[in-house]
Amino acid sequence: MKFGKTFPNHQVPEWAHKYVNYKGLKKQIKEITLVQDALFRQEQGAASQDGPARRRGRESKEQYLGHPEVKKLLAAFFFALDRDIEKVDGFYNMQFMEYDRRLRKLLSSAQLADITSVQRGATGYLHAPLPQYIAYGERERDGLPERYVPPHATDMSEDLAEVLTILLELRSHFRNLKWYGELNKRAFTKIMKKLDKKVGTNQQHSYFQARIKPLEFADDTPIVKALATINEILDRISPCVKDLQDKLRGEDRRLLQGSSSPIDVASQLVTKDDGAGLINELISMYRSVVLIPTRTLVTLLNKSALSRSFSCVDEILGIIPTLGDPSDINGRNFFHHHVIALGKKRTKSLEERDNINSLLSDSLDLEAAIPPEPNTRLVGAFGPDGVNSDDSPAPLSHILQQLPAHLRPSLLQRDNYKRTPLHYSAQYGLCEVTRIILQALSEWDAWNADVAIDDIDVWGDSENLTPLHLAVIGTHPLTVSTLLSFMNPEKSLNSPRLLHLATRLNSPSLLNSLLSAKGFDIDYQEPENLETALYVACKLDIYEAAEYLVKQGANMELGEKLFGWTPIFAAATEGYARIVQLLVDHGAKYDLFDESGWTPMEHAALRGHLDISQLIRITDNKAITRPKFATDWNKSTRPTETTNGLLSALTPSESGSTTTGSENKSSSLTPSTSNEMYALPARSSTSIDKISEPNKGNHRKVLKSQLSHGKVQTIKDTQLPQQPIKSFGHSFLQKDESVILLTLGTNDNRSTIPAVSLNKVPVAKASSTELDTALSLLVTCMDNLDAEPVMLDLPLHENLDSVTFKVPYKKDSSYTIFFDIVPTYGYSMANMNRENSSGMHSNVGNSTGPAYLDAQVGQCGSRLHYDQLGRDTPNTYDQRSRHQASQQKEQIATKKQSKILGRAVALLDSAPTSVGPNRRSIAEAITIPIIGSDTLEVLGIIRFDFLVVTPFVHKNLSVGPAETYWKSLVSTRVIGHRGLGKNMNTNKSLQLGENTVESFIAAASLGASYVEFDVQLTKDNIPVVYHDFLVAESGVDIPMHELTLEQFLDLNGERQRHQDAREAHRNHRSPNGRRLSMDDSSAELIKRSLMMRGDEDRTARDLNTIYGDRMRLTRTFKKNAFKANSRGHAIASSFVTLKELFKKIPQNVGFNIECKYPMVDEAEEEDIGPIAVEMNHWIDTVLEVVYDNVEGRDVIFSSFQPDVCLMLSLKQPSFPILFLTEGGTAKRCDIRAASLQNAIRFAHRWNLLGIVSAAAPIVIAPRLAQIVKSSGLVCVTYGVENNDPEIARVEMDAGVDAVIVDSVLAVRKGLTREAQDADTL
């Protein structure tokens, strides 16, 4: 999955609109390339009509960088890029200054000094000594020594919890901001790299150095220092926990024993509501009322209010000079503390007071994953509308009534976060407390109903959050309604974005509260992407919110900015069936084109959501249901005439738009007006996934012509010569080479276990493990011939391709793989090379120098330009090499810059469980621990599986003549399925047994150019032709690899008790001497017996009964109620080996050999056990037979098992490979086989000839055939749908190269007749 796809998923949700507009910049690059292509075609003139317009790399004369139109677009791109840089840098600086202010405030607070003695540290923050507070001991007042009252342990626990909360919150904020800067820096780097690659500029390095590297967000050093300071403080706080816990337990014992210490007496007086006694006790403690610390009075007032001790409240209000404590760590007054206490529901039971240790243990375990959790709330809340809080209004109401006038401003006082008590009541959903506060402000004439409660200038805190924002984030609909009820109903609110936030929270009641206020439009579109709240709900599968919005009349036809997608596009593409059904039931239009020319039906079908594509299927427009990309089925559409315009960009989440969106950018499709209304924009990215860009052609013109005029300019019309389908022969493994394919995680999409899982890190070890920053995974193989490790950013993307290493061939597969956890930006391969040279990490390789720094690190990694990242350039590297000694000292000072944080090691020869020679486990993910480099503790685990591809050696192994793969495939053809067709449980027509010699010969004689059959391996390693994984003819289910060839060919035959020829002939030979399957020999004996008794009429019926009874308990018979190639259902024939088939079938008949190797879910469905033949051995055995007997015959390999296909591609260059996919007709756990889209990606990556898809997605959406063709792949279909000549013709008109059918004769005749009729016209 590309960076653009995952970029939004790694963003801090509340800051989403502050990131670089990556999609928009990417689309601007696409627009530049389209102009360059057009200029190139114009320059080539008529020659461009004979082939695709393809500019050759980065030749300046082909980039047209001096052309006015290109210069104009480049200027617009850099202008937009500069604005994004300013936006990111400005936001980053503003947030950093705020967090820095909070941290410095904390470091100078009395509470922190009371908890732990923080000395002058080594970081930049502890640059000055902290104020000396005497927490426990003597202090002087007016020159006289006085005993200072030590803080109550409970107060200490509250201070500790408060300090801890601030530290963890700041730590989270700094980490989020660090990730924000790193992610944007990564985005700028990638977009500049893309500009250089696509447009041909050379701006990446210079632009980064001049415009990005000098900015604050590109240098995380201050944030690293801040995090180091926080970790240092947390390290010092941790030892205090046990001491404080002991003190709490001691106080609990004193309370139970009726202790009479002054502090305990004050607490008991508050509980008894003895106000007068409380004041007297305080006077006795502090000698005078004026000497009682304000902090003590505020704390006692809060305790009295929480205890409903109104007498104590009144007494304290009479003597307290102010409600705010100047030394308060957060600058909060009584009202702040009281509202927060109500929100957190802090009671004073002994059990809950004893939970400080659990609080710390819960809070001090820090997640090591880098990006913030997408659904993490910005602030804490304890259930909707304070359901778990103490929303008790009586104490606060009493205090507000008794509050002296000079203390009333405290209700609007702001703390260090610029929040008033109203902010906190909204945050915790205390709707009654909110009502009391607003009512009091109204009575005091301190409330202006004409000021919107979401006015940031008036109510915004330090992060521009108002009480309304906090109530929405906390999902408090009643609190929202309470806030809005005190506003002027005619006053409009200013934050329509809150509607989208409420939608993401999936709260219909919250949406209802917001929509009841003026200023919230249900159809509001966000300016950046024009997405409505309904679109967000449909895109994220938020059903309840979507249902509410639809029922409230939300416009379902408003398109977003990028491709004009309406909500039904988003839901259909993601496969959200409930959402699609909801939209269809309420009248949403689905006969629409997006800006790239595709319908929701086609998007769903491409991605394997066939149930959805049936639900929104378009049946009344021939431009969609019967496209004609080739008017003669005997002639194919050339790959150069493919839908390049429709495939030139990625999915909407990967591309962007810079144009202003219209209210509805999707075109309505009706039978009478579709051709006129449908048009593809001249410069637009596409909404269909890009598979590749091998063909830059004129197919966009062809498609537009076909949709507008119903006629396509075909090969015959243009008189173009036939072009190769694919270059003949591809790179393959030499006899001394192997390939290792590592799949991080697993290809089983049912697994929810991440590939890399890092443990929670205790705060005490955070500074030593250093897992609190952006991390990457460095995968290295010691034997890698390219000496290039692979760097992958964490968290790993979904659907990540395999990591590939080419290594020397070792018979025992004794390869070692290292998985290193390193800082994303603090680690460089230059450091790794230095470590190698010093013997620290010898596994990584010994390449040195700038060329190595700029190495391509693998197909799945990214090119490591350290100069881009503001770290190392070739010059600085040379200089550093000359001063290695000083650099080593610097490494010690800043160990993070060159440190491997953790490592896991896999020995591939012993990693999987041994299950016998030439056998393997079908599915076995390997799990290994990650060991910390310093502590040697387990930091987490890595889960992966692997495949080692060994070379195939044969005397005939060579690249054939320089022609084409399957060169005769320039005309659409019919392929016989399992010969003349697979057997079915019907008596409508006579059937030849499938996968038999007779069936293959019959198919060839009736016009099939190729015959398709299934090959499996027996126990004694002989390839045989058989379809089912389980052999059921014996009456029991036996996997093929558990039967020898002799057992298979003579299956269920009576054991020869005598060796004489007469008995052998009678029991096992037919009159013509051919070898029979047991079905035939048994049938002969039974038939003869019945005929001798005169029961000829019952013969057929009895045979069916006999064979049915024999196999009635097998899985195959239970599933299908019959068995293929069995007497009674077909003309049964003998089984055959692959070698025999080469000898018996005419040379002119091509073979489509399907390699029948089970996938994980197939093995589970058939219950064949977890053991299979080792794949290298399986394929080598089959290839051996093919190369020994091919003798010029056309041969194609195909398989549903993706690993078999890629292995066949890597082992030999002579025969093309087709990847079989069910295209969503059946659910497959292997992500590569889950959809037509993934099949195309897989086939293109491994240089396969094409795909063989189930016909269903192509029948539903015929234009998808051009998606396959545009990727340079052959498109073949199979399935019962192909037996209908009319449907087969539709597929071929759409560009399908071949159809695999059961009714060869009928389909061939139907197609021929239509072709002849077309010629006569």
From Swiss-Prot:
Gene Ontology molecular function: any one: glycerophosphocholine phosphodiesterase activity
Keywords of this entry: ANK repeat, Cytoplasm, Hydrolase, Repeat
Catalytically driven reaction(s): sn-glycerol 3-phosphocholine + H2O = sn-glycerol 3-phosphate + choline + H(+)
GO cellular component, one term: cytoplasm
Main location: cytoplasm
Subcellular location(s) of the protein: Cytoplasm
Record region (Disordered): 630-698, 868-893, 1056-1079
SUPFAM superfamilies the UniProt entry points to: Ankyrin repeat (SSF48403), PLC-like phosphodiesterases (SSF51695)
GO biological process terms held by the UniProt record: glycerophospholipid catabolic process
Biased composition range(s): Polar residues: 633-646, 873-893
Family: Belongs to the GDE1 family.
Protein name: Glycerophosphocholine phosphodiesterase GDE1
Organism: Eremothecium gossypii (strain ATCC 10895 / CBS 109.51 / FGSC 9923 / NRRL Y-1056) (Yeast)
Classification of source organism: Eukaryota, Fungi, Dikarya, Ascomycota, Saccharomycotina
